[in-house]
């Protein structure tokens, strides 16, 4: 049975050109809609510079290129050359700077000033031109973890084109508290018109991108501790092009009894997650969630014809769902884990099926990190690697079958394992290596380094368990982290030296900072343009701009853009959710890999012709 085709966004070739010491590095997309035999001719200044079509990669080093050169690429199918792509001018360095309209700070009701810094971002094509726009969250300097009292500044959401053109700003208002657990924003084409929408939790006083107020503009539900434990809660879908509110419904589930969520002061009640999933296998649905320490509720919606229609509700308080309480993480993942072509929600140590029924619960409980992908390519299907917080549970680290919940192996820790990573970092071992560490980053001696089969290959694991990134030209994944001095983080990309058991820094740009304190997150990591390698975005020290860094390493490996992989693309959508986690692919990408399967997709909207 052929899988259903999934709705996907229209993308151009994403051609980029970067000046290097050896010449001009040129890179472009191989699309999920391309035939596997598609090859490419490259043009410089209107003249073809390739004698034969390039068939084995989608990058090229033009040793005769200059800083003033202009490039185009054309696909070649069955000997016939297609239209030329959009023109690409040469970057002088491997970075694109996106200027920002930094907002002014303010003063809280108790007289304390605050400023803003650029925080999490997502991307989507909000105008249908095949190029990504940036949706950015501004974080006030007084943003709070839920465990802490205090007023916060207002959360702002901006939209920019990648040339820095400011498009609109949404102000979530005084009745949305600032912090990693409060605002999770989904950027995705939810209705299939070829243009992405933005969906997130709102409240009385939220101002949309057109200046319209949602609810009661004068309402102020903050208590003396700066918390918001009463008043209406909403879910709003905004038009991507303008930031205009398209529809607003009551946020489900409502607060109910504070104690149901795990405490009596509003900490665990206000733990929100969000994701996008193809619950019918063809079109995306919005999934909004509340709670994971005890009560856990997920609600799925379809956005069609300008309205939100509820698809299902999963509530751990429902009879028969008791085993699903207290299993969620500070993040989630989305993938078809049971092979039926429809997505499931992997919610920490549990999973919810595409139809809103419980798929399984391992009972191992809450954790701070989780990775879902083809971690063990010798097995059929996907796996989940997770670290766990409850010292009384049998495992502090576990690897399970993503579809059944079967624990394949685990490691007893007897303590809260704070961070964990799964990535193919050593070509000597097929599949991912996995490890857990305790922040702020010890050497992993307490848990060790394991293969996906559970073989302990070293007492010493990498000290980094933050993000993994495909950066250089081989199939081994690098690690993305930062140097933390107690107040700020200096981002870096490192490569694992298995022979010497250490990390070696291969890229560390100046003038940029990491996000989210000790977590060291980028603004966003995603395959934004060029070939299949990933870009990474960090903020400048003063948050006056974002800097998008791309690799200039040549590679002979050729895959379709990761943004056309179903698991990876949805990973970009949920990356901003709470404790940011890196995206993974639906297939094993690493040493000894098989050729990735061609994704089953169709292009949404009016741009269904072959992209340029």
From Swiss-Prot:
GO biological process: cell wall organization
Binding-site residues, Ca(2+) 10: 527, 529, 531, 533, 535
UniProt keyword annotations, A-Z: Calcium, Cell wall biogenesis/degradation, Lyase, Metal-binding, Repeat, Secreted
Recorded GO MF terms: lyase activity; metal ion binding
Residues reported in the UniProt entry to bind Ca(2+) 3: 189, 191, 193, 195, 197
Binding site for Ca(2+) 9: 529, 531, 533, 535
List of residues binding Ca(2+) 8: 472, 474, 476, 478
Reported function: Pectinolytic enzyme that degrades type I rhamnogalacturonan from plant cell walls and releases disaccharide products. Degrades rhamnogalacturonan, polygalacturonic acid and pectic acid. Has very low activity on pectin.
Family designation: Belongs to the polysaccharide lyase 11 family.
Listed name of the protein: Rhamnogalacturonan exolyase YesX
Name of the gene encoding the protein in the UniProt record: yesX
